């Protein structure tokens, strides 16, 4: 681990330099993340059709809700990790890392089970019709199957950033976006999987990025790494994560509600095609 990549530089390097080192990768990663849905829409529109784009748009509120739970754990955990590292409590920081894994699995599985059973009623509430429900259902089911991966990917990326590896977090995001863009045309046009192909492209791209994150945290030479004794959920850590992550969770929840209202309004006044416009 080089000095530049060490989390210890957070307490020694000039603040201006640290702001640049952390802000620029974060901006690039956030910009790249916005290309996810854009890429899916472009390939689905050309390969499946206009109604499929409307079906995709109907899944956005549910995907925003999944991201809200991801930020609940990710933001809270990244803040706690930074605090523990600042206190030189490296064992405590590792315990936070272990709790991130378990919390993401628990929340991801619960979210998946709940919405797999309620998927059709939820999509109809979001504004689906008989013309668009099949597209939205096909896409969202696959996304839900990979929901635990999404939660883990978002959570570990936040911890990567707060533990002194902002560039690695950026590369994980960029890799996911690039792989998604490469697999979309292959699965939609090459294999003829339709909207399901786009969903599989999203899940597989996140699996690959998550694999890189897991490899990083599996190395004993890293200050933060997987090891025995860190995976038991501890009430003080869980409370800290949830209390800190509550604000970004509520912000994402509001974003989810806004998209629902917009979609329902578009359906009422413009029909199915307006939702995908």
Region locations from a protein language model:
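Short alpha-helical transmembrane segments in multi-pass integral membrane proteins
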Residues: 1-23, 81-148, 190-245
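N-terminal transmembrane alpha-helices
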Residues: 10-47, 61-76, 80, 105-112, ...
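Transmembrane helical elements of multi-pass membrane transporters/channels
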Residues: 21-40, 142, 176, 205-209, ...
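Helix-loop interface residues and adjacent transmembrane-helix termini in multi-pass membrane transporters
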Residues: 35-38, 47-50, 84-87, 162-163, ...
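Interfacial/gating helices of multi-pass transporter permease domains
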Residues: 44-64, 131-135, 195-196, 237-244, ...
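Small-residue-rich hydrophobic transmembrane alpha-helices
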Residues: 53-113, 150-169, 263, 275-277
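Hydrophobic transmembrane alpha-helices of multi-pass small-molecule transporters
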Residues: 65-68, 180-184, 210-214
């Amino acid at each position: 681990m080089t000095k530049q990549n060490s989390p210890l530089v957070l307490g020694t390097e000039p603040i201006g330099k640290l702001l640049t080192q952390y802000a620029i990768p974060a901006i690039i990663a956030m910009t790249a993340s916005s290309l996810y849905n854009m890429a899916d829409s472009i390939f689905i529109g050309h390969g499946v059709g206009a109604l499929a784009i409307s079906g995709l748009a109907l899944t956005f509120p549910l995907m925003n809700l999944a991201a809200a739970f991801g930020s609940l754990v990710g933001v809270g955990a990244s803040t706690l990790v930074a605090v523990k590292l600042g206190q030189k409590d490296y064992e405590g920081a590792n315990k936070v890392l272990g709790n991130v894994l378990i919390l993401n699995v628990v929340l991801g599985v619960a979210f998946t089970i709940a919405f797999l059973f309620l998927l059709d009623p939820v999509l109809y509430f979001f504004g689906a019709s008989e013309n668009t429900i099949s597209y939205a259902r096909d896409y969202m089911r696959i996304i839900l199957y990979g929901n635990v991966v999404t939660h883990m990917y978002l959570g570990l990326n936040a911890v990567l950033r707060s533990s002194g590896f902002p560039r690695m977090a950026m590369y994980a995001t960029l890799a996911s976006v690039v792989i998604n863009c490469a697999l979309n045309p292959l699965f939609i046009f090459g294999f003829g999987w339709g909207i399901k192909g786009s969903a599989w492209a999203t899940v597989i791209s996140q699996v690959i990025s998550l694999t890189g994150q897991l490899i990083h945290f599996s190395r004993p030479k890293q200050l933060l790494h997987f090891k025995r004794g860190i995976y038991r959920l501890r009430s003080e850590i869980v409370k800290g994560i949830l209390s800190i992550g509550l604000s970004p969770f509520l912000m994402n929840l509001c974003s989810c509600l806004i998209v629902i209202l917009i979609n329902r309004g578009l359906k009422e006044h413009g029909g199915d095609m307006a939702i995908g416009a």
